[in-house]
């Protein structure tokens, strides 16, 4: 008989709406002694069946639900079905945008909690961030090797969130032979160098793909300041779109070296591109003091809030950096500003930028609201999957 997790009265409502998390404070009792990652059934207080998921006793999220179908078993075929469904849901996008790099599995939003898989050319990069994902590692790799026989499989589970599951950080080759780094992927006719062993996240920010293309609409003949540029891909799109000048700013010299490489592999001259290894906050203040201005500024900072206790500080950080950026823009200029903090509500982010405009004594108009690329879907019952928020503002 399956191990059974009974919820407290009233705590079944989120699962009935198909939210996949069961928190420790919502559990009434546990029938049996589940092992870490073991499949368990979740029932309401009155005993009716709700879902089947993976147990993680050390985590605040003690069950992540794999399925809400009572007849569905969690086995090799389950993972194969989920991966095939996810691939089918992306095939049109891949053809439309000529993608050789994309997110194949977006964790909970693709029905595989704690599992992220990105495909970069002939390498699949996995992040296994939950106990259930970790326990099923060999099965997941076996299925991927069957479905993508020409791909190496590499793990990038080198993230702090695994500690919350009682898991150690880990990375390394899981299957096949890893090609020489960097790989070259393509999107929208643009080539991008990616190192899956050393790059941020799984190697690259695939989620900003659509926003890079949107930014390119505003840059022809303009001066562009690309802040927190990483490997310079907003600047790369800008160069291809005919920007007059581009300044790529990042604290990492390695990232800037890759930005230079990206220009070369696309056959673009970087005579009008400046690469600046600098702290963005300090540099923006310096430019303000010097009276320097730009036509277009991209602000794509790292996550400012990892938990709710950091949200107030994150709000101050976002307001400060947006205020200074607004002061650097020429009248009629454009600010593209982002938050990748999942805890930051979109409406609050817009309010922060509006308040920053007041402090900067600039009038702005929001002309577009941006989000993550469509290979990063948001499950209808999983609003936490909506993490990337962006705004395009015209500045006067």
UniProtKB/Swiss-Prot annotation:
The protein's Enzyme Commission number: 2.1.1.191
Any one GO molecular function term: rRNA (cytosine) methyltransferase activity
Domain PUA positions: 2-79
Catalysed reactions, semicolon-separated: cytidine(1962) in 23S rRNA + S-adenosyl-L-methionine = 5-methylcytidine(1962) in 23S rRNA + S-adenosyl-L-homocysteine + H(+)
Cellular component GO terms, alphabetical: cytoplasm
UniProt keyword terms in alphabetical order: Cytoplasm, Methyltransferase, RNA-binding, rRNA processing, S-adenosyl-L-methionine, Transferase
Keyword flag Nucleotide-binding: no
Disulfide bonds: none
Family: Belongs to the methyltransferase superfamily. RlmI family.
Protein name (database record): Ribosomal RNA large subunit methyltransferase I
Organism for this UniProt entry: Shewanella oneidensis (strain ATCC 700550 / JCM 31522 / CIP 106686 / LMG 19005 / NCIMB 14063 / MR-1)
Gene it is expressed from: rlmI
């Amino acid at each position: 008989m399956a191990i059974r997790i009974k919820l407290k009265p009233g705590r079944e409502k989120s699962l009935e709406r198909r939210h996949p998390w069961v928190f420790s404070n919502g559990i009434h009792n546990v029938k049996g002694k589940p092992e870490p990652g073991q499949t368990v059934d979740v029932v309401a207080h009155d005993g009716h069946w709700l879902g089947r998921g993976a147990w993680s006793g050390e985590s605040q999220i003690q069950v992540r639900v794999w399925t809400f179908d009572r007849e569905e078993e969690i086995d090799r075929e389950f993972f194969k079905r989920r991966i095939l469904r996810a691939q089918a849901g992306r095939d049109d996008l891949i053809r439309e945008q000529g993608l050789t790099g994309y997110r194949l599995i977006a964790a909970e939003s693709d029905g595989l909690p704690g599992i992220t898989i990105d495909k970069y050319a002939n390498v699949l990069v996995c992040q296994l961030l939950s106990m259930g994902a970790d326990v099923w590692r060999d099965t997941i790799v076996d299925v991927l090797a069957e479905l993508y026989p020409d791909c190496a499989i590499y793990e990038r589970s080198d993230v702090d969130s695994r500690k919350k599951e009682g898991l150690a950080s880990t990375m390394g080759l899981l299957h096949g032979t890893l090609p020489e780094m960097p790989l070259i992927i393509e999107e929208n006719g643009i080539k991008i160098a990616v190192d899956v062993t050393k790059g941020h996240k799984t190697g690259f920010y695939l989620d900003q793909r659509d926003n890079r293309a949107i930014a390119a609409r505003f840059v022809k003949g303009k001066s562009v300041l690309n802040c927190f540029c990483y490997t310079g891909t907003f600047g790369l799109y800008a160069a291809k779109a005919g920007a007059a000048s581009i300044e790529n700013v990042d604290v990492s010299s390695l990232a800037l070296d890759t930005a230079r490489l990206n220009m070369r592999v696309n056959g673009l001259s970087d005579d009008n591109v400046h690469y600046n290894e600098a702290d963005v906050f300090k540099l923006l203040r310096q430019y303000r003091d010097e009276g320097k201005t730009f036509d277009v500024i991209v602000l794509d900072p790292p996550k400012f809030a990892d938990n709710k206790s950091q949200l107030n500080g994150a709000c101050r950080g976002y307001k400060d950096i947006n205020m200074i950026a607004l002061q650097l823009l020429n009248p009629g200029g454009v600010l593209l500003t982002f938050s990748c903090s999942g805890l930051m509500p979109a409406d609050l982010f817009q309010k922060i930028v509006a308040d920053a405009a007041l402090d900067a004594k600039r009038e702005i108009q929001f002309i577009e609201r941006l989000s993550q690329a469509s290979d990063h879907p948001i499950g209808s019952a999983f609003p936490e999957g909506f993490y990337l928020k962006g705004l395009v503002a015209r500045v006067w």
